[in-house]
Amino acid sequence: MKDKFSFQKNYDFNLVSDGLYEIWNNAGFFKPKDKNNSFTAILPPPNLTGTLHIGHAFEVSITDQIMRFKKMQGFSINWIPGFDHAGIATQTKYEKIALKENQKYFDADDDKKSEMIMNWALNQSEIIKNQLKSLGVCLNWSETKFTLSEQANKIVNNCFKNLYENGFIYQAYTLVNWDTKLNTAISNIEVINKPVNQHLHYVVYKLANDSKQELIVATTRPETIFADVCLLVNPKDKRYTNFWNKLVVNPLTGKQIPVVTDSYVDIKFGTGILKCTPAHDFNDYEINTKYKFDFLSCIDSNGILNQNASKFQGLSVLQARNKIVKWLEKNKLLVKSIPLTSNVGFSERSGTVVEPMLSKQWFVDLPKLKDHLYLKKYPDFIPKRFNKQVSNWLNKLKPWCISRQLIWGHKIPVWFENNTGEIVVGEKPSKNLQNYTRSKDVLDTWFSSSLWPLICLNWEQDDSFHETELLVTGYDILFFWVLRMLFNSFFETKKLPFKTVLIHGLVRDEQNRKMSKSLNNGIDPVDLIRNYGADAVRLFLCSNHTPGDDLIFSEQKIKSAWNFLNKLWNVTKFVIQLENDQEISYDLDKLSLSETWILAKLDKVIQKITKLLDKFQLALANQILVKFVWDDFCNTFIEAIKKEPNQLKPQLFYTAKSVLSNIAILLSITVPFLSERIYQQFNNKSVMQATWPLATKIKIPKLFDLVLAAINDLRNYRKQYMLNSQQKLVVILSGKNAVDVKQYFNFSWIELKIETNKKVSFKYQIVDDTTQRLKSLQKQQAFFESEVKRSQAIVKNKSFLEKAPKEKVKSEFLKLEEYQKKLTETNQLIAKLTKAH
């Protein structure tokens, strides 16, 4: 697959990547070849609510690195892509668009609305697909899945039915997170807690049989007083011992409610008395499971106070709160109101305050399901510290609310008989369908997502389920998605859905802040690819993270990645120029010192990074490879080639292209586009057809390391004594190998002399003109003394310190510090030379 590509121009990532992805895809490189040696992974399906964000780019880049590595190791890879219909997120997104562009949507029936959303969603999936392709990921597009497809629906309905029939799905009237704007139950992950400035109101509850005695209760939600069922005090709080089991009067309804003792109450908060409103607070709801008081509700599904709120009925929560506070104050039932900042839950989708609301919903009994499954083995979580976190979550499981009052999603497969209330689950009734009404609710999008492995592997067609080898995902959805996948997949198949879960962190901005719309600090990977190319973006993402930890975004590091690729491009151009038509007999025993050294170094790198990749230490493997390419190959070997005799050039080209081809293979898992172009220059096939190189255990020649150390010492000497380009160092090489290595010392600033000395292998000596060196240093000394005096005069000038910009003042102090440092170093060198002289 020799590609006619020119390396003659400057590095242009657009030209480099142009057309390559289509070639790979059309050639079938992303499709599995052998079912018996497979390595399968599933793509966490991106939501169809927008374009890819930097977190997606991070996740798919590191997964692609693993998949390409496994392919080169001989595995038949199958990385299955797909998209999540994303329920509430997609519906609200489309409805915002429809407000501006499609008013007909709001007059349509539910089926027509779903059709409109579906058309928009499918268009979004094409946009996201093209963005993924621009990153060069080796996804098997022929197996693309969708969580709201007919195929997915069969699996979803079947799982719902099986869970229901086995007693793990039930319907209950209980407290849920309620979005009063969208009129639906929502999940915990869709509730965003934000600090809100509000007031803590101290309200009077008078004793029922003695109005002169009273209890003061602090609350931020006086509008829920209508639904109070009791007051709670801590039994350790001696202030209220006389009020135990007494009755107090609800200040808004006049009804009597008891005072109950419970150790849950925080003595230090407010007055140490808690009003219990189980229909409007999750903690109160849990407390009431012990006391079994009747539930009272005073807020309806639209966030409006209902008939239980007396004259405040019909007001919104905030309107009612303000008026109730004024009424309490007027009737001398309000002691005080003090400012307080506390967290309030907001709906991620509508932005409205979330109300705890009593509602009839469908639930999966996760605690019961966990006990039933009795999983003795779990996937390997990497890093291992997440095993403990998973274990903690498993011990704190609660029933999962899976019903939503939306249009977009899998309709809950439940039909109710209109007269008897009989329930048919899974498939529509086979007889008298007209006598049944189907549930209007849809399933939580996480329910269908929890069956993603089964959807990806076509479980409805073939129930011989095979677990996937790998899942790469973020820690932020470990509970909401991964554990639920584990439960539902194992329930259906009796097998784990994946062997290994590699966990990554979030991508944070350069100030280490979580990216969010409110901070306007999101990074668009498409813009980065447009500016730096996919290879540079991928190299940054794959080289600067630790498993399980957050990645700090740095555009400067992306620029550094681009600089590395530009360096590699130019070195490739140089190697290409070495090529000629002369045939050679390539003999490993007759290689030059530099050739043996670079091949041995390459061998060591192959060993190291293969071990690291096997352990999913991806970034560390990249860092080692980049260092080898930059320092050993480009800066050392390529520079050494330039000093080798011309008669060795044909052989040197062969060695250089061999090393460069191996670099292309090693680098291709992270930098696919440029690696492909480099590999094709020297091989008649794609890098995706290459096999991962094996280490051959070549020994690094010690002599060349000695040469490199000597050259490094000479450079440091010049720097230390501040020698300019005109001042040459006289260097004597001696030893039996001196003649063999002299070409490596061929620098314009070295005057080389060779002496015969067969007693040693190799040594060098600097013939130093101490007098000349002292003169040079004394000249530098005078300059630095002058600059120190000048700078000291400036920073002692009061006028300068008062009037000059802060940055200017800071800069001058830094200059002074630097000049003082250099003067000290120069003085030390002069003293050293004077003593030696």
From Swiss-Prot:
Q: Does the keyword Transit peptide apply?
A: no
State the coiled-coil residue ranges.
767-837
Q: Single Gene Ontology BP term?
A: valyl-tRNA aminoacylation
E.C. numbers: 6.1.1.9
Disulfide pairings: none
Q: Where does ATP bind?
A: 517
Q: Which GO terms describe its molecular function?
A: aminoacyl-tRNA deacylase activity; ATP binding; valine-tRNA ligase activity
Q: Which PROSITE patterns match?
A: AA_TRNA_LIGASE_I
Reaction(s) catalysed by this chain, per the record, are: tRNA(Val) + L-valine + ATP = L-valyl-tRNA(Val) + AMP + diphosphate
- Find motif ('HIGH' region) and give its ranges: 46-56
Q: What does the record's free text say on domains?
A: ValRS has two distinct active sites: one for aminoacylation and one for editing. The misactivated threonine is translocated from the active site to the editing site. The C-terminal coiled-coil domain is crucial for aminoacylation activity.
Check the record and name the NCBIfam families matching this protein.
PRK05729.1, valS
On subunit structure and binding partners, the annotation says:
Monomer.
Put simply, this protein is called Valine--tRNA ligase
Gene this protein is translated from: valS
